[in-house]
Amino acid sequence: MQIHIEPISKSRIDQVDFDHLAFGRSFADHMLVAEYADGAWQKVTIQPYGPLEYQPAMMSLHYGQAIFEGMKGYRSVSGDIQVFRPEENMKRFNKSATRMCMPEVPKEIFLDGLRTLLKLDQAWVPAKEGCSLYIRPFMFATDEYVGVTPSTTYKFIIFNCPVGSYYSKPLRVRVETEFIRAAKGGVGFAKNAGNYGCLLYTSPSPRDTERSRMPSSA
């Protein structure tokens, strides 16, 4: 499948402090965008990273047909870019897609598209020890419709973030005894958006470390 490339007019890389990288706050110049409609994958484009415009009735906002993956690219001693297990990430991504009634993304879009994207944005892969390029493939339903049924159109996107360590200090472990994320027969194995949104209530955040807990009978 042909990939159309629309290069950015001026890179934003000089705006990033690669010596002090936060996780998930800086984004590389380009993103890969593929569209699914009429039962097949259509146009595939690499374009400047930027906003997307959708209608309020877009189905993924209401019914949760949204999945994602995460992997990392590293700069080797020789300067090459190496990605850890991209084929396995693609398999898991498509397993999530099947569970959420979404189309699988073919290898020529997922892997070949990623390879082309990394080649274009290779300057964004950090060389500093402990840093990497976080790669985020994701897909979401785009039909404009209010009703519980699988969408007929989807968007698949890959964007990249130069990152430092995910955690800035050692972890403290808390065992949750009241709330669960997964249940037998459910979607706990899938990397769908709802699996992570439901965790926020049980995860203390800097904004609300003393949040109240809902009664277990609620």
Predicted regions and their residues:
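Conserved alpha/beta cores of soluble small-molecule-handling proteins
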Residues: 1-200
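Intrinsically disordered, low-complexity segments enriched in polar/charged small residues
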Residues: 196, 216-218
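Conserved small/polar residues in nucleotide/adenosyl-binding loops
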Residues: 201-208, 218
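Basic polycationic patches enriched in arginine
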Residues: 211-213
